[in-house]
């Protein structure tokens, strides 16, 4: 897969930020208006992310895009 390391990094940052905010996968998924299983796949790095999806997650976490990709 192309960009495996980058996808893994972004996925782990999403998980890390979610935990810092004391949110469950279900709670963040609700804030993002997505299924819990979809967010679980994102955090596990098992799906390709779009910029739109990353921005939705950033908004739900109340962080900037830079906080996810730094």
Language-model segments: residues:
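Conserved hydrophobic/aromatic packing and binding residues within compact polymer-binding modules
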Residues: 14, 28-29, 39-42, 68
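Recognition helix of helix-turn-helix/homeodomain-like DNA-binding domains
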Residues: 33-47
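Short C-terminal boundary/hinge segments that cap the last helix of small helical domains
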Residues: 51, 62-70
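Short, basic-rich loop-to-helix N-cap that marks the start of a DNA-contacting helix
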Residues: 46-56
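A detector for short, charged/polar N-terminal pre-domain segments
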Residues: 1-9
């Amino acid at each position: 897969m192309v960009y495996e390391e980058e996808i893994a990094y972004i996925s782990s940052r999403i998980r890390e930020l979610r935990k810092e905010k004391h949110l469950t996968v279900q709670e963040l998924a609700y804030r993002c208006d997505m299924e819990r299983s979809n967010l679980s796949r994102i955090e596990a790095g098992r799906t390709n992310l779009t910029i739109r999806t990353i921005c939705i997650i950033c908004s739900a976490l109340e962080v900037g895009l830079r906080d996810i990709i730094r």
